Regions:
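Basic, Lys/Arg-enriched alpha-helical interface segments
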Residues: 1-64, 73-77, 83-114
Length: 114
């Protein structure tokens, strides 16, 4: 039984739609794990970014990837942004994820509204 439900903001939805079937299956494994475990998912797969925003961490090929998310009311896991992890872009991407979260909260928006 799932801990919650996963909803994707347009950025993540578009990125997922552009993946090959093989890549999508790989990423779906981690998203499904997040859906099954929710806030209980810990260890190397998740990390808090700031406040209520976390990142789902996974490898695809030789690259590290991240999907930022937050847990909204009703155990809804909202996927906010996607990025490839590099040392050079981490601070910028964390700020971008925080802005996406703040926009969601300010607009009382959730992915179901799209």
């Amino acid at each position: 039984m799932a801990w919650g439900t996963v909803e994707a903001e347009p950025e993540v939805d578009n990125w997922l739609g552009a993946l090959s079937d093989r890549e999508f299956g790989h990423v779906a494994f981690y998203i499904d794990l997040l859906e099954a475990e929710g806030a209980k998912l810990r260890g190397k797969l998740t990390r808090p970014l700031q406040g209520d925003v976390y990142e789902l961490r996974f490898h695809m090929g030789t690259e590290d990837h991240r999907i930022s998310y937050w847990i909204a009311s009703g155990r809804r896991i909202i996927l906010l942004t996607h990025f490839r992890k590099t040392r050079m872009n981490e601070r910028r991407e964390v700020r971008r994820a925080i802005r996406a979260y703040e926009k969601c909260v300010a607009e009382r928006h959730n992915a179901e509204d799209d």
